[in-house]
Structures are given as C-alpha cells and as structure tokens.
C-alpha cells in the first residue's frame, strides 16, 4: 500500500493540544521531536469468509451449518517515538463490519463482535458490527529497561497472551522488563506483567476475572518470565504465572538450531504446567494435581523453498475438566495464555492422556516462475484421548475407561502481491477435514473440548498499509 512521508505538522499540532489540555508543561522542541519524527501510523484492511459444517450424530449423522459468514475488519495503529528518548504513547483501534451471516451460524464467530459485550455475559446469541479501542498505552524506556501501562498486549517473556482474530485481545494492566546483551556470552531478557481486566477481540468491553463458577472473583493475573540466548543457536526460556488465589502455571522451553545438508533444522522441547488451588469437587475444582502439556518440535527448510514441520504433544489433565488449558481463567475468552503450538487443524488435541503427531509442509512456487504463490498441506493424528476422570453430572455417553482418536488434514493456497501499491497484500484459502473417531455428540461423554466431524473452508484477504 502507498506510503506517505514528510513533515507531520498536523500530528505535532494535535499532540501539542493534548499536552496543553492535560496540564503538562510543554517540552522543548529538541526533546519532543523524537516523539513525532519517529512515530508511525500503520493499518490494514481484512476480509474473512468462512463455511464450516459439523456432523450431528444425534440426527442421522447429518452435516449442519456451524459457521457461515463474511466479515470485514480494518485497523489503524499509531506508535509514537520517544520524547526525551524515554516517554511514548501507542493508540490503536479496529472496526468489524458484518456483511452476511447464515441464520444457523454459531455465535460468536470471533471475527465480528459478539452481541454480548463482555466475556462473562456471553449468551451466544449473535454477532454485530462495531469499533473497538484495542491499544491505549503509555510507554517508557531507559537503557535496557522498558515498560508499558494501559490497554496493552503482552510483548515480553510472561505466560500472558491475547486471543487473536485479525486483531489481538487487550489486557488492562502494566508490563515491564529489561534486555541485557553480554556479547559472545549471550543475551538475557526478562519481564513481569500484572493485569486486572481483559477483552477478547470479539468483545467490546473489558471484564474482570473469575473462577469457573463465574461469581468467585479473581482480583488479578500476573506472570514473570525470562529468556537466555546463548548466541550459539541455543535458547532457554522459563516463566511462572498466577490467577490470584486460584491457578498456578509453569512454562519451560529449550530451543536449538543447527544445519543439516546446508539448511537449518530448528528443534524445541516445551513444557506447560498448571494446577488449581481448589480441592472440594466443586465447579471450581478443575484438575487433580498438576496438569501438563509437553511438546517436541522440528522445523526444516529445504532448498530455500520447502518448509517442513514435525511436531508432537502429550497431555496429562486428570480431574473434572478433562483437558489442558493454557489460560489462567477457564471461562471462554476470559483471558489467554502462551502456547507455542498451532496446527490450524481445528481440534486443540488437548484431552487428558492424549498424544498427537503433526506433519506439515509449505512449498514456495518461486522456482516455477510463480513468485508470491505457495501451497501447503498438513495432517494430524491423535490417540488415547480420555474423558474427565470424574464429573458431578455425567451424561449417558460418559465412560471414564474410554479412549478415542482424532485426525485431521488441511490444504492451503496462498498468494502475496510482490510489488506495486498493494505490495504485501495476501490472499489465503484454507480447507480442513476433521474426523472424530467416535459417535459421541460434540462436547459429550466427558470430552468437554472435543466436537464431532467437521468440514471447514476459510478465505482471507490481508492488505496492510503504511501512512507514515
């Protein structure tokens, strides 16, 4: 998209006006110019169309509409430079416009806005258009130290993370960290974040945090994390997080990269752990002991045109919930947490006892005189998925000794415009066929995060632009 450059006198005047109205002393021009001259205003226009059908095993195995909608998004993201090389401001907003939606489509579709403005008020009744302020943060830096506060997205090493549609979710809180470079000995980075409210990108209003009963208040979430890069292709990461008085979470990751046949092979081991502090068999009692998800990942780029991925996960999640969650509050869209595993094959493959293997490949067609085009495919097979080890009110399908299998495959086609005013605009088509190898209805039988067979088609357009 077109880039505009030059003096930003209008922006400077607006900032000066805001400063004056706020009652702050005007800063000398020489010390304020970094705030203006180093600022950026970027954005994007986004289109999403989805058709997803799901099998209903209670109605003759018919496939029924689960999602069917088309939605536009657009955003503007202002990031200032730093006045006095220390103080700055970031502000961003986006809009969602619902173009069409099938009456049988499920809600929320997570691209438009839910008709329920808050996470804990969600009633699954519909979607709507609207505008959301998703970033409004004061920022600070001094030497190796940085900090941000306000409406923010986590950027450091903690376990807190936002949901994503085209845009990210938003926390109300503060985050601070530091980066230290020790030359050949390595580099250390660490950060801490505290938050008391959150909104997913499909909710318009912030909500507080609660335990699983949606009434017992959790005053805050917080997390501390660190990363050490040894500068020899070996990286260690660790983090700890808490939902006040309720959930503890743990994370560790080791990554190593080395060459095979002249191309890089990236490997990692990842551990995610969580446990609750409730042990009374109430609705807030999620896990028996520590639940965890472990992962091994391998990524290889061959001949500079083929990206190959081989990844595996293993889950332990004994207890009433029956599956592992990376977020510290269990209610849908109430917060989110770090998980560096993303397969885009519909299921989370995170049931108690479940093991899963993923293989994916993406082929860049530039050597076929098709610059910007890429095609890909992936497959997941998972087994030993167990239901919750106990439930207060089990349904007729519940059998704690049962295990089921899941599998899915996906196909991708991508085109990215290589030059001109629309350079960087991407078109992507994604198809998934998901198979639940059982006749248990969606979410039934103690499998609270497994649904029935699906066919899913997504078409996306992402058109970024820069104003200055």
Curated annotation (Swiss-Prot):
Upregulation: In the absence of chitobiose, expression of chiPQ is silenced by the MicM small regulatory RNA (sRNA), which sequesters the ribosome binding site of the chiPQ mRNA by an antisense mechanism. In the presence of chitosugars, the chbBCARFG chitobiose operon is induced and acts as an RNA trap to degrade the constitutively expressed MicM, leading to the translation of chiPQ.
GO terms under cellular component: cell outer membrane; pore complex
Annotated GO biological process: diacetylchitobiose metabolic process; monoatomic ion transport; oligosaccharide transport; polysaccharide transport
Transmembrane intervals: none
Keywords tagged on the record: Cell outer membrane, Ion transport, Membrane, Polysaccharide transport, Porin, Signal, Sugar transport, Transmembrane, Transmembrane beta strand, Transport
Membrane topology value: Multi-pass membrane protein
The keyword Glycoprotein appears for this protein: no
GO terms of molecular function: channel activity; porin activity
Subcellular location per the Swiss-Prot or TrEMBL entry: Cell outer membrane
The keyword Transmembrane appears for this protein: yes
Signal peptide coordinates: 1-32
Function according to Swiss-Prot or TrEMBL: Involved in the uptake of chitosugars.
PANTHER family for the chain: CHITOPORIN (PTHR34596:SF2)
Family note: Belongs to the outer membrane porin (Opr) (TC 1.B.25) family.
Protein name: Chitoporin
Native source species: Escherichia coli (strain K12)
């Amino acid at each position: 998209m077109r880039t505009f450059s030059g003096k930003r006198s209008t922006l400077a005047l607006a900032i000066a006006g805001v400063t004056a109205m706020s009652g702050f002393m005007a800063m000398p021009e020489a010390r304020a110019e970094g705030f203006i001259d180093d600022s950026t205003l970027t954005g994007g226009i986004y289109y999403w169309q989805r058709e997803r059908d799901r099998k209903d095993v209670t109605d003759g195995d018919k496939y029924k509409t689960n999602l069917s909608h088309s939605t536009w998004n657009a955003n503007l993201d202002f990031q200032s430079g730093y006045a006095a090389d220390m103080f700055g401001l970031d502000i961003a907003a986006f809009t969602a416009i619902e173009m069409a939606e099938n009456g049988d489509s499920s809600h929320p579709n997570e691209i438009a806005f839910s008709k329920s403005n808050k996470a804990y008020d969600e009633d699954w009744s519909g979607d709507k258009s609207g505008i959301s302020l998703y970033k409004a943060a004061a920022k600070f830096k001094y030497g190796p130290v940085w900090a941000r506060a306000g409406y923010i997205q986590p950027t450091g090493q903690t376990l807190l993370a936002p949901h994503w549609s085209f845009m990210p979710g938003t926390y109300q809180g503060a985050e601070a960290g530091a980066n230290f470079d020790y030359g050949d000995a390595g580099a250390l980075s660490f950060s801490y974040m505290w938050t008391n409210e959150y909104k997913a990108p499909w909710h318009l209003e912030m909500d507080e945090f609660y335990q699983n009963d949606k009434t017992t208040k959790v005053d805050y979430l917080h997390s501390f994390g660190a990363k050490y890069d040894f500068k020899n292709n070996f990286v260690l990461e660790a983090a700890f997080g808490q939902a006040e008085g309720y959930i503890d979470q743990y994370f560790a990751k080791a990554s190593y990269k080395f060459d095979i046949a002249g191309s890089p092979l990236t490997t990692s081991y990842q551990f995610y752990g969580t446990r609750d502090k409730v042990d009374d068999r109430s609705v807030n009692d999620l896990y028996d002991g520590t639940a965890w998800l472990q992962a091994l990942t391998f990524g290889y780029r061959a001949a500079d045109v083929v990206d190959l991925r081989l990844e595996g996960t293993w889950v332990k999640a004994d207890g009433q919930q029956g599956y592992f969650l990376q977020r510290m509050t269990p209610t849908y869209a109430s917060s989110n947490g770090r998980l560096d595993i993303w397969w885009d094959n519909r299921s989370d493959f995170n049931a108690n006892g479940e093991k899963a293997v993923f293989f994916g490949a993406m082929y860049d067609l530039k050597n076929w005189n098709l610059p910007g085009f890429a095609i890909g495919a992936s497959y997941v097979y998972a087994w030993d998925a167990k239901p919750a080890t106990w439930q207060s009110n089990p349904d007729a399908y519940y059998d704690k000794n049962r295990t089921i299998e899941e599998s899915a495959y996906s196909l991708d086609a991508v085109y990215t415009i290589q030059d001109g005013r629309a350079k960087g605009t991407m078109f992507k088509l994604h198809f998934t066929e998901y198979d639940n190898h059982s006749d248990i209805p969606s979410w039934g039988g103690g499998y609270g995060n497994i649904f029935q067979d699906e066919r899913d088609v997504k078409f996306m357009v992402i058109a970024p632009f820069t104003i200055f």
